[in-house]
């Protein structure tokens, strides 16, 4: 029973990490990236 629980927890954490990484990459480089603001371009001196 303990082995199954450990496997489920490990699988859940791994999938969560992969999902978060995929979402972060999509936000950074996908369609939503056009809506991100660039603070360096806003404050040119």
Swiss-Prot record:
InterPro entries: PSII_PsbN. One of its GO terms (cellular component) is chloroplast thylakoid membrane. The keyword Chloroplast applies. Keywords: Chloroplast, Membrane, Plastid, Thylakoid, Transmembrane, Transmembrane helix. The chain crosses the membrane at residues 12-30. The keyword Electron transport does not apply. It is found in: Plastid, Chloroplast thylakoid membrane. Pfam families: PsbN. Its main location: plastid. It is a single-pass membrane protein. GO terms for biological process: photosynthesis. It comes from the Eukaryota. May play a role in photosystem I and II biogenesis. HAMAP family: PSII_PsbN. Belongs to the PsbN family. This is Protein PsbN. It comes from Adiantum capillus-veneris. The lineage of its organism: Eukaryota, Viridiplantae, Streptophyta, Embryophyta, Tracheophyta. The gene is psbN.
């Amino acid at each position: 029973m303990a082995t199954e629980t450990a496997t489920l927890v490990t699988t859940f954490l791994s999938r969560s990490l992969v999902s978060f990484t995929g979402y972060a990459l999509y936000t950074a480089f996908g369609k939503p990236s056009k809506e991100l603001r660039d603070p360096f371009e806003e404050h040119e001196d």
